Each structure stands twice: as structure tokens, then as C-alpha cells.
Amino acid sequence: MSKLDEYVNLPYTLIVIPDLEEGGFTAYFPELQGCITCGESYAEAVNNAIEAKEEWLTACIEDGINIPKPNQQVVSWL
């Protein structure tokens, strides 16, 4: 398993919120500073976030930047 695969499979928190001003959804990983994307639908935002996470992690590995560990807290809203 590659170093990238190890990081991609870690349980990073994904937050997806509706964009009330522009429409669509914004998705981001709070542990991965600057790893943010959007999509016209919830599913598109999630898929874009998965791709963005892999690109973000790849850039960090290539540049020798320290990658934070996932937050172990459970996040939920009612």
C-alpha cells in the first residue's frame, strides 16, 4: 500500500453544507486546511471532496508537508 493510499483511507471528517446564497453545496475536511470544494448537488459535492482530498494529500506528500491525523471526535447535527 502506498503512502497516499494510507492517508486516503484514514477517516477524515467530511462536512457538507448547503450554500444558501449561491445554491449547491460546499464540502470540506476541517483537518485538512484549505481542502474545500463544492458541487451543484450533495452527491457531486461529496465526489468532488473525495477527489480534492486525494489531490491535497498528493501535494503534501510531494512537497514534504506534514499531514495531520484525523480528528477522533464524532460530529453530528440534529
Can you say where each PLM-predicted feature lies in the sequence?
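Short, charged, surface-exposed hinge/linker loops at domain edges
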Residues: 1-13, 47-78
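Short, positively charged
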Residues: 9, 15, 19-21, 39
